[in-house]
Curated annotation (Swiss-Prot):
Keyword annotations of the record: Cytoplasm, Isomerase, Porphyrin biosynthesis, Pyridoxal phosphate
Single biological process term from Gene Ontology: protoporphyrinogen IX biosynthetic process
HAMAP family cross-referenced by the UniProt entry: HemL_aminotrans_3
GO CC entries: cytoplasm
GO MF entries: glutamate-1-semialdehyde 2,1-aminomutase activity; pyridoxal phosphate binding; transaminase activity
EC number: 5.4.3.8
Family according to the record: Belongs to the class-III pyridoxal-phosphate-dependent aminotransferase family. HemL subfamily.
Involved pathway(s): Porphyrin-containing compound metabolism; protoporphyrin-IX biosynthesis; 5-aminolevulinate from L-glutamyl-tRNA(Glu): step 2/2
Database matches in PROSITE patterns: AA_TRANSFER_CLASS_3
Protein's recorded name: Glutamate-1-semialdehyde 2,1-aminomutase
Subcellular locations according to the entry: Cytoplasm
Keyword field contains Amino-acid biosynthesis: no
Gene coding for it: hemL
Spans traversing the lipid bilayer: none
Length: 429
């Protein structure tokens, strides 16, 4: 029995499903989860000593690669002065100033510890600011596991939940909790316009993944985002971009800088923690002024602005500002996507791939999908076989057909070539 299997058997005795986040259990692809012992650069090693080229990157944060010496040093130096204070630090100000500088739509920002906290708090603030209750979200977009957002959500819920019904995607969420959440089709402008026409003056906020990375990778159309911005402005609703995944991953200024659309609020995470638990929400000063202790919208957190997370995140944010960083990252990610498409074409396998910044999506279907409905038509059985063939050849992809992949600054040409060599074998199998 492998060491990975031994650990999985042991974990299931004390941890539900043997994992602390569902997709890690390999339920959708089958087989034994890999228990990771260490990682460096673009590589990870499991409990059996197997090395993998890593395309999960901790689900996005490791944009400069695992265990970057500057990030490690910053955390070690900070840890020597204690791990947490429960009081303000100067480093929190440095982090806030850096975020506001890099994302101009954010005039003020509040640090939290997870993406779920960021989106949950942003929606509460939007409701408090507008005095309205109704929220619009979109099919396949995942905004964390707050109750009101678990309706036709993406990420692991595409594997575990019934997504055919306009009802909570998780047991334990009362239907009454989600009655103020309206779910519309991603990239459907007409449906969005109709919703605003029917609910004029009732909509508190629209929240959207500008590049949806939790139903694989689906880009918002320019027309969709433009209409969203115009409708929110006209009706006084708050436009929230969930950039927990895309922030500093798609571009230095996030997906909003790539598209040239300015939201009222932005949620960030992943990269801003450099691998540590950290997230943030921020936006217009007049909206943020409603947040406690200035206003009546309450939000708090014992570990918000944690010194270790801030040290890792701030160092990462400074590293990614190096000249040419995003040009190279984008080029390498595109090279990977194009190489995978060519390998599939040569093997006669229906397949498509897309890439934006340091994110990529692979789809076992003809053509890149533009909506939740199109994503669900992918050949998941074929993906599962491909996933295991790649794993056997030392390439670690997301263990789900509905998750985006991530490239780091450490994925050089030799690593991409090794990946494509493995893919050619996998497609031919």
């Amino acid at each position: 029995m492998s060491r990975n299997q031994q650990l999985f058997d042991r974990a299931q005795q004390t941890i539900p499903g043997g994992v602390n986040s569902p997709v890690r259990a390999f339920r959708s692809v089958g087989g034994t989860p890999r228990f990771i012992t260490c990682a460096e650069g673009a590589y990870m090693w499991d409990a059996d000593g197997q090395r993998y080229i890593d395309y999960i990157g901790s689900w996005g944060p490791m944009i400069v690669g695992h265990a970057h010496p500057d990030v490690v040093r910053a955390v070690q130096e900070t840890a020597a002065h204690s791990f947490s204070f429960g009081a303000p630090t100067e480093a929190e100000i440095d982090m806030a100033e850096e975020i506001c500088k890099l994302v101009p739509s954010i005039e003020q920002v509040r640090l939290v510890s997870s993406g779920t906290e960021a989106t949950m708090s942003a929606l509460r603030l939007a409701r408090g600011f507008t005095g309205r209750d109704l929220i619009i979200k979109f099919e396949g977009c995942y905004h964390g596991h707050a109750d009101s957002l678990l309706v036709k959500a993406g990420s692991g819920l595409l594997t575990f939940a019934d997504t055919t019904q306009n009802a909570p995607s998780s047991a334990g969420v009362p239907a009454d909790v989600t009655r103020h959440t309206m779910v519309l089709e991603y990239n459907n402008v007409a449906q969005l316009e109709e919703a605003f026409a029917q609910h004029r003056g009732e909509i508190a906020a629209v929240i959207v993944e500008v590049v949806a990375g939790n139903m694989n990778l689906v880009r918002a159309s320019d027309a969709f985002l433009k209409a969203m911005r115009e409708l929110c402005t006209r009706d006084g609703a708050v436009l929230i971009f969930d950039e927990v995944m895309t922030g500093f991953r798609v571009a230095l200024g996030g997906a909003q800088s790539h598209y040239g659309i300015t939201p009222d609020m932005t949620c960030l995470g992943k990269v801003i923690g450099g691998g540590m638990p950290a997230a943030a929400f921020g936006g217009r000063r007049d909206i943020m002024a409603k947040l406690a202790p200035l206003g009546g919208v309450y939000q708090a957190g014992t570990l918000s602005g944690n010194p270790l997370a801030v040290a890792a995140g701030l160092t990462t944010l400074r590293l990614i500002q190096a000249p040419g960083f995003y040009d190279k990252l984008t080029a390498q990610t595109r090279k990977l996507a194009d190489g995978l498409s060519e390998a599939a074409r040569a093997a006669g396998v229906p397949f498509a791939a897309d890439a934006i910044g340091g994110m990529f999506g692979i789809y076992f279907r003809d053509g890149v999908p533009g909506s939740f409905a199109e994503v669900t038509k992918s050949d998941t059985a074929r993906f599962n076989r491909f996933f295991h063939a790649m794993l056997d050849n030392g390439v670690y992809l997301a263990p789900s057909a509905f998750e985006a992949g991530f490239v780091s600054a450490c994925h050089d040409d030799a690593i991409l070539q090794a990946t494509l060599d493995a893919a050619r074998k996998a497609f031919a199998a």
